């Protein structure tokens, strides 16, 4: 079953479930058995479809137009979120949303990439590709959180930092480097969740956290499969091979020790049930922040520095001399 056919099937079944629930709550308890049967059918079909996904399949799911974005998670997880604008240097970049909200009654700083939904909003938000002003804004909010001792939660969903001429003129590389440096040494607990695409340094700028989680069908890589295929194979048709070679899935990155955990997506994909996905993310954040906020900040900072300093470290095997 193709993804579009599956989504059509899911929509039809969900509508059927909605009607059966209305009847059940109206007092027609005889529909309970049929309701359970339909719900089971939905779970079985979806589970069967998503059980053997290739890395390229997961890339396509990570980019799905209906996949929940940062603003969706903010709306469903945090209370009284107040967005902050501007980098206090040049301007504001809508491709990064940043502000202060309440999580179970306690203030937290929330920062994330935002791609937008329709064409107009996507153009406004530059398709989730931040300019230097976006990273400077994120940097400002991180330092604000540190000043008032708020934990920092980030949501990563970007194909990468914007590679335009103006972005380079405004020192894109330094803006990313400053964000990475600030996040590495923040004296507050930090949690990052990769919710869609995690593209190169543009993603890393918001992902140097104490704990990094990935949604089941998100991806995180130094380059897109298309870019990798063009460079290594000189062929756009090699995207599937490139996706496999890049080890960009949550499963691969957990095994490699790059991330700390995988957040399951209900019904196999976040866009099929965004509300349930937000609930799972909320539970993960609550559990993680409860753990981190109890820790001494000096030991947490030391652990964070050690974690990222040790990535990519390797040993060269000693030379074995040959004897006649």
Regions found by a protein language model. Give the residues of each.
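Short, motif-level signal for alpha-helix interfacial/capping segments enriched in acidic residues
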Residues: 31-34, 134-136, 228
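Short hinge/gating elements
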Residues: 59-62, 123-127, 268-271
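Conserved catalytic cores of soluble enzyme domains
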Residues: 156-286, 290, 294
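Intrinsically disordered, low-complexity segments enriched in small/flexible residues
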Residues: 1-107, 275, 279-324
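Terminal peptide-recognition signature
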Residues: 13, 54, 110, 157, ...
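Short active-site-adjacent helix-start/loop capping segments
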Residues: 68-70, 118-120, 162-164
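Glycine-rich beta-alpha loop segments
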Residues: 51, 90-92, 98, 104-155, ...
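Short coil/turn segments at secondary-structure boundaries
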Residues: 65-69, 126-129, 167
């Amino acid at each position: 079953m193709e993804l579009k056919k599956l989504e059509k099937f899911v929509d039809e079944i969900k509508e059927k479930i909605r009607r059966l629930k209305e009847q059940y709550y109206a007092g027609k308890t005889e529909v309970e058995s049929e309701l359970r049967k339909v719900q089971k059918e939905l779970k079985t079909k979806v589970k069967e479809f998503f059980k053997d996904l290739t890395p390229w399949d997961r890339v396509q799911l990570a980019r799905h137009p209906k996949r929940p974005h940062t603003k969706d998670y903010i709306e469903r997880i945090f209370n009284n979120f107040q967005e902050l604008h501007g980098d206090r240097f040049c301007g504001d970049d809508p491709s990064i949303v940043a502000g202060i909200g309440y999580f179970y009654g306690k203030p937290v700083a929330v920062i994330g990439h935002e791609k937008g939904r329709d064409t107009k909003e996507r153009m406004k938000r530059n398709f989730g590709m931040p300019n230097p002003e976006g990273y400077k804004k994120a940097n400002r909010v991180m330092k604000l959180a540190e000043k008032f001792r708020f934990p920092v939660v980030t949501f990563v969903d970007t194909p990468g930092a914007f590679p335009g001429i103006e972005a380079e003129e405004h020192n894109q590389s330094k803006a990313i480097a400053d964000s990475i440096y600030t996040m590495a040494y923040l004296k507050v607990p930090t949690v990052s969740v990769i919710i869609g695409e995690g593209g190169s340094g543009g993603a890393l700028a918001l992902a140097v956290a104490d704990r990094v989680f990935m949604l089941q069908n998100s991806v995180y890589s130094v380059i897109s499969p298309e870019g990798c295929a063009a460079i290594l194979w000189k062929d756009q048709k090699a995207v599937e091979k490139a996706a496999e070679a890049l080890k960009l899935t949550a499963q691969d990155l957990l095994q490699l020790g790059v991330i700390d955990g995988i957040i399951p997506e209900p019904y196999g994909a976040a866009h099929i049930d965004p509300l349930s996905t937000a609930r799972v993310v909320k539970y993960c954040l609550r559990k993680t922040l409860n753990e981190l906020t109890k820790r001494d900040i000096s030991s947490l900072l030391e652990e964070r520095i050690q974690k990222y300093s040790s990535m990519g470290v390797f040993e060269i095997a000693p030379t074995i001399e040959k004897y006649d």
